[in-house]
Design a protein with these regions (language model features):
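Conserved small/polar residues in nucleotide/adenosyl-binding loops
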Residues: 1-3
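Low-complexity, charge- and small-residue-enriched intrinsically disordered regions
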Residues: 6-8
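A short, charged/proline- and glycine-enriched loop
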Residues: 10-17
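Structural alpha/beta surface segment adjacent to cysteine/selenocysteine redox centers
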Residues: 23, 29-122
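C-terminal cap of thioredoxin/glutaredoxin-like
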Residues: 31-38, 115-175
Length: 175
C-alpha cells in the first residue's frame, strides 16, 4: 500500500479520483461512456474537470493529433464495448460550445450522469438534441464556461499534466 493510500485509510477517507474531460477529444468521448459504470463499480469519490486542449508545446501538431485520435478511437472503441463513429472531421464549434456549456453547469454527480449522452449528441453533430439536453440539464453562460475550464486547466497544470481523458488517483495518472 502506498503512503497516500495508507493516509487515506488511516483517515477513513474514500478513494478520490479526478477526471479531466476535454470536450472535443475522442478519448474523452470514450472515457465519458464508462464514467458512470466506473464510479458505480468502485467505492470512489469522482471529481470531474473540464479542460481545454493541451497547452503550449505539448501538442505541436494539434490538428494532426486530433485526426489520429479520431481514427484511433474509431479503431479501438468496439473492442472495449464502446462506440465511436468514423469521424473524418472534428465536431463543429457550435455543437462543441453547447456541449461544453451543458457540462460546465453540472456538479460532479450530474456530470457523471449526463456526460456520455451530451458527448454522443455532440459527436453526432445533433444540435437539436444538444439544445434539448441543455433544457433538461441546464447550461452555463460563456463566462461561466471559461471560468470552469480555467479551473480545470489550473488543476491539471498543478498536477503536472497536459491532456484530456485522464484520471488522477493517489499521485498517479491513468489513461
Amino acid at each position: 500500500m502506498c503512503i497516500r493510500d495508507r493516509q487515506r485509510v488511516d483517515q477513513k477517507l474514500p478513494h478520490h479520483v479526478e477526471y479531466f474531460h476535454f470536450v472535443d477529444d475522442p478519448y474523452s468521448h470514450l472515457t465519458a461512456q464508462i464514467l458512470e459504470t466506473f464510479s458505480a463499480r468502485y467505492n470512489i469519490e469522482l471529481s470531474c474537470y473540464l479542460v481545454s486542449k493541451p497547452p503550449g508545446d505539448n501538442a505541436p501538431e494539434f490538428e494532426l493529433l486530433m485526426n489520429l485520435a479520431r481514427y484511433d478511437a474509431y479503431m479501438i472503441a468496439d473492442k472495449y464495448g464502446l462506440s465511436f463513429e468514423d469521424h473524418k472531421e472534428a465536431p463543429k464549434q457550435d455543437v462543441i460550445d453547447i456541449a461544453q456549456s451543458i457540462l460546465a453547469a453540472q456538479d460532479d454527480q450530474s456530470f457523471i450522469s449526463c456526460v456520455a449522452e451530451v458527448s454522443h449528441a455532440m459527436w453526432s453533430g445533433d444540435k437539436e438534441e444538444l439544445l434539448e439536453l441543455s433544457n433538461k440539464f441546464g447550461s452555463a453562460s460563456s463566462k461561466e464556461v471559461s471560468e470552469v475550464v480555467a479551473r480545470g486547466d489550473a488543476r491539471r497544470a498543478e498536477l503536472k499534466h497536459y491532456s484530456g481523458a485522464m484520471l488522477y488517483y493517489a499521485g498517479e495518472w491513468y489513461w
